[in-house]
């Protein structure tokens, strides 16, 4: 422990004395950025048969308690995770991430089974073994890849790769002649469980492709793949081309329908606006008409005023009588104002005309 503490102190001193980007150190008041050594993030993980291992050095497996507490930098905990990794997806990456983070100092070794083993024990794969090796190599959490990994882990394989723990989800993985291929690993105390990611798996991806096979076949035919490459018969090829043309016609009809709906909607909006404006103008017109020609309109008042003025002009006002009980005696003759002479007597014809005019004036007054 003392040696480990002294190594940490020396490492801190080296970090402080390390020059910064401009040649300055932390002691000069300018914090320096130490570049991390992240080979796994810059290059693909190496294959196990390309790494030279010094088997002369003794190897002692660490316990779970020691691994959880932390190990020295030169002695990482070697964790092994295996699988098929066909159509490498986020579920695979999450499982490897969990295996990498099981302990503070972990060296993750990933085994990938060959095509022969996989086809015999599990079934046909979409990707061949080289494609699957390459996919796992480029996962950021992987430190080493084992090609042609065994289906069942043997003590010799564990010793050869100096494996401390095996990481896998704790669901029993059955195989030919065994209910759980990790049973002996669990009994030896070397099993480190991880959690399976729900909703994503290679089988689910293949199911989606099979379910929508016609869609993907038509898409690849459009992109230049031949019917022979897609293993599509002549009749199905013509059917897919016909469906594609029908879909194009449907799309055009749908576009026209949408545009016509938009046009009709705009026309309706415009018509509603015009109707509203027409109603407003009609109300204004009716109101103006009633104000002018209605029962109490301005025209009737004008006619009444004109009629009254005409009546005043035609018949002047009579002077009040001297006595209300005394009746005025008809004058025998008409006298011109400002003259002392009496007018001559009226002829019978003139007298009848005067009576008729007086009768008309009296009728107008009664009206």
Swiss-Prot record:
<keyword id="KW-0832">Ubl conjugation</keyword>
<feature type="modified residue" description="Phosphoserine">
    <location>
        <position position="347"/>
    </location>
</feature>
<dbReference type="InterPro" id="IPR041723">
    <property type="entry name" value="CCT"/>
</dbReference>
<keyword id="KW-1208">Phospholipid metabolism</keyword>
<keyword id="KW-0007">Acetylation</keyword>
<feature type="binding site">
    <location>
        <position position="197"/>
    </location>
    <ligand>
        <name>CTP</name>
    </ligand>
</feature>
<feature type="repeat" description="2; approximate">
    <location>
        <begin position="329"/>
        <end position="333"/>
    </location>
</feature>
<dbReference type="GO" id="GO:0042100">
    <property type="term" value="P:B cell proliferation"/>
</dbReference>
<feature type="region of interest" description="Amphipathic">
    <location>
        <begin position="228"/>
        <end position="287"/>
    </location>
</feature>
<dbReference type="GO" id="GO:0140678">
    <property type="term" value="F:molecular function inhibitor activity"/>
</dbReference>
<keyword id="KW-0443">Lipid metabolism</keyword>
<dbReference type="Pfam" id="PF01467">
    <property type="entry name" value="CTP_transf_like"/>
</dbReference>
<feature type="modified residue" description="Phosphothreonine">
    <location>
        <position position="342"/>
    </location>
</feature>
<keyword id="KW-0597">Phosphoprotein</keyword>
<comment type="pathway">
    <text>Phospholipid metabolism; phosphatidylcholine biosynthesis; phosphatidylcholine from phosphocholine: step 1/2.</text>
</comment>
<keyword id="KW-0182">Cone-rod dystrophy</keyword>
<feature type="repeat" description="3">
    <location>
        <begin position="343"/>
        <end position="348"/>
    </location>
</feature>
<keyword id="KW-0444">Lipid biosynthesis</keyword>
<keyword id="KW-0808">Transferase</keyword>
<feature type="binding site">
    <location>
        <position position="92"/>
    </location>
    <ligand>
        <name>CTP</name>
    </ligand>
</feature>
<keyword id="KW-0225">Disease variant</keyword>
<dbReference type="GO" id="GO:0006656">
    <property type="term" value="P:phosphatidylcholine biosynthetic process"/>
</dbReference>
<dbReference type="GO" id="GO:0042587">
    <property type="term" value="C:glycogen granule"/>
</dbReference>
<dbReference type="GO" id="GO:0006657">
    <property type="term" value="P:CDP-choline pathway"/>
</dbReference>
<feature type="binding site">
    <location>
        <position position="85"/>
    </location>
    <ligand>
        <name>CTP</name>
    </ligand>
</feature>
<feature type="region of interest" description="Autoinhibitory (AI)">
    <location>
        <begin position="272"/>
        <end position="293"/>
    </location>
</feature>
<feature type="modified residue" description="Phosphoserine">
    <location>
        <position position="352"/>
    </location>
</feature>
<dbReference type="GO" id="GO:0005783">
    <property type="term" value="C:endoplasmic reticulum"/>
</dbReference>
<feature type="binding site">
    <location>
        <position position="169"/>
    </location>
    <ligand>
        <name>CTP</name>
    </ligand>
</feature>
<feature type="region of interest" description="Amphipathic">
    <location>
        <begin position="298"/>
        <end position="315"/>
    </location>
</feature>
<comment type="similarity">
    <text>Belongs to the cytidylyltransferase family.</text>
</comment>
<feature type="modified residue" description="Phosphoserine">
    <location>
        <position position="331"/>
    </location>
</feature>
<dbReference type="InterPro" id="IPR014729">
    <property type="entry name" value="Rossmann-like_a/b/a_fold"/>
</dbReference>
<keyword id="KW-0963">Cytoplasm</keyword>
<feature type="compositionally biased region" description="Low complexity">
    <location>
        <begin position="319"/>
        <end position="339"/>
    </location>
</feature>
<feature type="modified residue" description="Phosphoserine">
    <location>
        <position position="362"/>
    </location>
</feature>
<feature type="repeat" description="1">
    <location>
        <begin position="319"/>
        <end position="324"/>
    </location>
</feature>
<comment type="subunit">
    <text>Homodimer.</text>
</comment>
<dbReference type="GO" id="GO:0005634">
    <property type="term" value="C:nucleus"/>
</dbReference>
<feature type="binding site">
    <location>
        <position position="122"/>
    </location>
    <ligand>
        <name>CTP</name>
    </ligand>
</feature>
<feature type="modified residue" description="Phosphoserine">
    <location>
        <position position="319"/>
    </location>
</feature>
<dbReference type="GO" id="GO:0045190">
    <property type="term" value="P:isotype switching"/>
</dbReference>
């Amino acid at each position: 422990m003392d040696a480990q503490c002294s190594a940490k102190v020396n490492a801190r001193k080296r970090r402080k004395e390390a020059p910064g980007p401009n040649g300055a150190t932390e002691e000069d008041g300018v914090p320096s950025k130490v570049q991390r050594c992240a080979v796994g993030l810059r290059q693909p993980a190496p294959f196990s048969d390309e790494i030279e291992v010094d088997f002369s050095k003794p190897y002692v497996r660490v316990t779970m308690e020691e691994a959880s507490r932390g190990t020295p930098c030169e002695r990482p905990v070697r964790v092994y995770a295996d699988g098929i990794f066909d159509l490498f997806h986020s579920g695979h990456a999450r499982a490897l991430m969990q295996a990498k983070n099981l302990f503070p100092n972990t060296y993750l070794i990933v085994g990938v089974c060959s095509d022969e083993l996989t086809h015999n024990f599990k079934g046909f794969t979409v990707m061949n073994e080289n494609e699957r090796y390459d996919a796992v190599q480029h996962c950021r959490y992987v430190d080493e890849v084992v090609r042609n990994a065994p289906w069942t882990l043997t003590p010799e394989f564990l010793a050869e790769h100096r494996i401390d723990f095996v990481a896998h989800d704790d669901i029993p993985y059955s195989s030919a002649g065994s209910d759980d291929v990790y049973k002996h690993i669990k009994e030896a105390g070397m099993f480190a469980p991880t959690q399976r990611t729900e909703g994503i798996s290679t089988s689910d991806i293949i199911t989606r492709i099979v379910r929508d096979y016609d869609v993907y076949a038509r898409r690849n035919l459009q992109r230049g793949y031949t019917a022979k490459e897609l293993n599509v018969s002549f009749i199905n090829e013509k059917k897919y081309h016909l469906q594609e043309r029908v879909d194009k016609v449907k799309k055009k009809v749908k576009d026209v329908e949408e545009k016509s709906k938009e046009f009709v909607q705009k026309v309706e909006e415009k018509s509603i606006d015009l109707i509203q404006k027409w109603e407003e103008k009609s109300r204004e017109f009716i109101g103006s008409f009633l104000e002018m020609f209605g029962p109490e309109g301005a025209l009737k008042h004008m006619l009444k005023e004109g009629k009254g003025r005409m009546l005043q002009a035609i018949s002047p006002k009579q002077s009040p009588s001297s006595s209300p009980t005394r009746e005025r005696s008809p004058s025998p003759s008409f006298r011109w104002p400002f003259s002392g002479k009496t007018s001559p007597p009226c002829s019978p014809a003139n007298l009848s005309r005067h009576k008729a005019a007086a009768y008309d004036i009296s009728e107008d007054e009664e009206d």
